[in-house]
Design a protein with these regions (language model features):
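C-terminal catalytic subdomain
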Residues: 302-416
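Extended hydrophobic packing segments that form well-structured cores
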Residues: 33, 373-476
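Glycine-rich, highly charged phosphate/nucleotide-binding loops
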Residues: 57-77, 255-262
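Cap/lid and interdomain-hinge subdomains that line or gate substrate/regulatory clefts
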Residues: 3, 8-14, 46, 116-234, ...
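Long, internal scaffold/assembly segments composed of regular secondary structure
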Residues: 234-237, 241-323
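N-terminal basic/disordered segments at the start of proteins
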Residues: 2-42
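Short, acidic/small-residue loops that bind anionic groups at enzyme active sites
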Residues: 96-125, 133-138, 296-309
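Periplasmic-binding protein-like
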Residues: 78-88, 109-111, 272-278
Length: 476
């Protein structure tokens, strides 16, 4: 493979099955068996007490809770989230003690099993409906955040529960990955773009590390590469297969290939999740290229690449990728669409991943070429964005209040007619004018991260409930 790609991380859940002494034990035993079957059917790894660790391998007493907590602490680095299963009323103190002693500080999903109308006798009645309320109350008292299922109760083997687990997995991935994220910064921001300034210190205290490198170091490494290097040739072939390049000179593709190879090595050597790049003006003056196509390829391979050294925008891209499992992009809030107050044009010039487009081709940069000339600005990706639902996210470090904040909304790309350049699409957002007022009044940048998926609720829950970020969620 000529370009590295990030593999989606394997998700491991910690499982706690509850029980309560005055309710039928066989329900807890069967519940443990069922949740294991669901985990294996869905392909998840899990950490759970063995049947000989406690009575049936479930948690009821304080001694049970200690055993569960010790097991979870041994697997602290691998467990991404915890699922509480309540086959009967279950003991709220057992759950709370296990969570408090383990002290993993990760997302928690609470499932409670439904009673069946024809099985409401003493042997079969669960009362998990009531028990779930009790568990939630106690976790609230302990200050332990948790997630709820789409229905208050349902069977462990229901499709609804499986869908909720998939949703919960995304929340877990966002929380776990952001707490140890490593992002690269190539060069300084363009001098004209104060809008993309950010606080590295605020990010660091939230677990996000920035690894900087000067653009001159990248260019210096490029100068040491030979044109006939087999790795360079591999990159050239990949770029040509990625998007049509018929109007693109071989010299330009060679430069893109070398740039890609050097940045790829830097990403691997520093174990980076994503990077932002000074894409103008220095690289045109000193290397004679625009890096948009290279950035598009990295983003398509699940290594988000943001332009104009927009680290805050890059974080938005990374979050949306974690929430959706698919590539993300960064765009400008760019134009009105006629007189429609709820439609606008999202645009960049562009480095969008190929999967965003109906079709693509490589071109000279439509804007920078007017300033620098066509010979120095090969490498942009052009095309229209697909007609699909979309989630938009802007992250900022607010130095005034010492916090991370974000703006989040959802919309739909349309097929309204538009003849323009770059990477673009018409998007409809309910009550768009109010959304724009929020963006302006709160000092958000003109960049917005995007994914072609509806993941707003997942992002909102992860960022607010588990990371404590200040998120403005604009929705219909």
């Amino acid at each position: 493979m000529a370009f590295i790609t990030k593999q989606l991380q394997e998700t491991i859940f910690g499982i706690i099955v509850g029980n309560r002494d005055v309710f039928p034990d066989h329900l807890a035993k069967e519940g443990r068996k069922q949740i294991i079957e669901v985990m294996e059917e869905m392909g998840y790894n899990y950490v759970i007490l063995n049947e000989d660790d406690t009575h049936y391998g479930v948690v009821e007493t304080y001694e049970d809770a200690k055993k569960c907590a010790n097991l979870f602490k041994k697997n602290r680095d691998s467990i991404a989230g915890i699922i509480l299963c309540m086959p009967n009323f279950s003991d709220e103190k057992g759950f709370a003690s296990a969570l408090k002693l383990a002290n993993l500080n990760i997302p928690i999903l609470i499932q409670a099993s439904s009673d069946e109308i024809d099985k409401m006798d003493r042997k079969h009645r669960r009362d998990a409906f009531c028990g779930k309320i009790s568990v939630c109350s106690v976790l609230y008292q302990h200050g332990i955040p948790f997630s709820l299922t789409s229905s208050h109760t349902y069977p462990i083997k229901s499709e609804a529960f499986k869908n909720d687990i998939r949703r919960f997995e995304k929340i877990c991935n966002i929380v776990k990955t952001l707490k140890r994220a490593r992002l690269g910064q190539i060069g300084t921001r363009p001098a004209a773009f104060e809008t993309v300034r950010y606080s590295e210190k605020i990010l660091e205290i939230n677990g996000i590390t920035i690894e900087p490198i000067d653009l001159s170091e990248i260019l210096g490494a490029i100068n040491k590469l030979q044109n006939d290097d087999p790795k360079v040739k591999e990159k050239i072939e990949f770029i040509k297969a990625y998007t049509p390049t018929m109007d693109f000179p071989e010299e330009g593709i060679l430069k893109l290939a070398k740039l890609s190879l050097v940045i790829e090595k830097w990403v691997v050597d520093n174990d980076l999740d994503a990077f932002a790049l000074q894409c103008w003006p220095s690289i045109q003056d000193n290397f004679g290229i625009v890096p948009c196509a290279m950035m598009s390829i990295f983003s398509e391979g699940l290594i988000p690449a943001a332009c104009e050294v927009d680290i805050a925008g890059l974080i938005g891209m990374f979050i949306l990728q974690l929430a959706s499992g698919s590539p993300s992009a960064i765009l400008d809030w760019n134009n009105n669409y006629g007189d429609d107050p709820n439609k606008m044009v999202l645009f960049h010039c562009s480095n969008l991943p190929k999967s965003f487009f109906k079709d693509t081709r490589m071109t000279i940069h439509p804007i920078i070429s007017d300033l620098k000339g066509a010979d120095l600005t090969f490498g942009a990706i052009q095309g229209r964005i697909k007609t699909q639902p979309c989630t938009l996210l802007r992250v900022e470090t607010d130095d005034i209040f010492g916090e991370i904040k974000a703006f989040l909304t959802e919309g739909n790309y349309t097929d309204d007619p538009l003849d323009t350049y770059g990477g673009y699409g018409v998007i409809k957002i309910p009550n768009l004018q109010q959304a724009l007022k929020m963006v302006c009044n709160e000092g958000f940048a003109h960049h917005i991260a995007a994914t072609l998926n509806e993941v707003g609720e997942i992002v909102y829950e992860a960022l607010t409930k588990y990371l404590g970020w200040n998120v403005i969620y604009h929705r219909d």
